[in-house]
Amino acid sequence: MESKNFKLPSPLATVIVGTQFGDEGKGKLVDYLSANYDIVVRYQGGANAGHTICFDGKSVVLHLVPSGIFHEGCTCVIGNGVVIDPVALLEEIKTVENLGYDVRGRLFISHNAHLIMPYHKLLDSLHESAQGDQKIGTTGRGIGPSYEDKVARKGIRVVDLLNPELLKEKLRENLSAKNKLLRNIYDREEIDVEAMVQEYEEFDKIIDPYVTNTQAYLTRELQAGKTVLLEGAQGCLLDVDHGTYPYVTSSNPTSGGACTGSGIAPNYIGKVIGITKAYMTRVGNGAFPTELLDETGELLGKIGHEFGATTGRKRRCGWLDLVALRYSLAINGVTEIALTKLDVLDSFEEIKVCTAYLLDGKELHDFPTDHQTLAQVTPVYTTLKGWMASNAAARTFEEMQLEAQRYVDFLEEQVQLPVTFISVGPGRDETVFR
């Protein structure tokens, strides 16, 4: 048989994943790398996670629009795996435009992305309030209820805004069930269907120019040789399948979610960069083996400004956990590590790193997948010498403080992956590449 030269996909896409409980500093890396990519895609989550970008003396928080929007040559895509709050999205678009950046023609929204409706946010808050001590720690932004409707095949998608009659029909069907909950369970007033239809028809007029079949668009661009950077929200340990269930988010922040949430085929993925904070934080409830409930934890939070970009909630702080990190690196197929917020450790004489867990007198090196077991483990620490000086002026690894270099070397040795990016300060330029 005559051989045929079929054109196979080139690995032109890079996935950026958080390897911890979110808040790892993904926004800075995406912002930094966006200048080298043609397209940046957000593939899951919603307005429950904020990416903070610092440039030109400004600090901007984005929840839905990809961080690459601040690079003029970059096109941004909100993928089908994202749940979109139209109100929050329009506010972000306005914020970006007010900073002098063009959005139209540079931002595309998947017609298959699901919408967060007002009843999702209301039910989210009411349900969380009713949980008492069993609260998950939701942001109250309607993310979970929107994903619930998606899985139940009752969700309202962006494409539904383009058909007012279909939108009205779906809203009536959904609100029939939601209003029963509001009235009978939570003793709240029902939501008016007609008012909501009118409100969302107005959203359609504004959003329509941005809506497209993003899966087809991304595939065409990749086939044409364009490069794509995919960014998720939260982190691996909050993944609904692989995280500390039930204290997790409602989607898949892992690298597998990048494909399902964007429509990009796996064989287009060439690199997976794991964003890892030099220490650990967590927002809300759930097991956290290395959490520091003392002055050290308070100091980490104070120096690191550890307050949620979305909710303003104080983050719990602790030392770096290599048991959890190895687990995340394996699940995501991470090819290299980006180490963030190393500067927060500049003031510590000693720095501890968890290398194993103790449970019932036995040492564990595998991350427990059930929350009950994880809540019972005790961390085993290795203590490293601190560097007690700033690395903010360093632009090469050799210019960093010697003990800071040793900290990075120790991390690489423990996880057997290269650390190729080190953030030594919040600014764009306060970065070391290797």
Swiss-Prot record:
Pathway: Purine metabolism; AMP biosynthesis via de novo pathway; AMP from IMP: step 1/2
Textual note on the cofactor: Binds 1 Mg(2+) ion per subunit.
Compartment(s): Cytoplasm
Residues at the active site: D23 (proton acceptor), H51 (proton donor)
Entry keyword set: Cytoplasm, GTP-binding, Ligase, Magnesium, Metal-binding, Nucleotide-binding, Purine biosynthesis
BP-aspect Gene Ontology terms: 'de novo' AMP biosynthetic process; IMP metabolic process
UniProt: substrate binding residues: A309, T310, T311, G312, R313, K314, R315
Pfam families: Adenylsucc_synt (PF00709)
A single Gene Ontology CC term: cytoplasm
Class of this enzyme: ligase
E.C. numbers: 6.3.4.4
Residues the record lists as binding Mg(2+): D23, G50
Family that this chain belongs to: Belongs to the adenylosuccinate synthetase family.
Complex and partners: Homodimer.
PANTHER family noted in UniProt: ADENYLOSUCCINATE SYNTHETASE (PTHR11846:SF0)
Name used for this protein in its record: Adenylosuccinate synthetase
Organism per entry: Chlorobium chlorochromatii (strain CaD3)
High-level lineage: Bacteria, Pseudomonadati, Chlorobiota, Chlorobiia, Chlorobiales
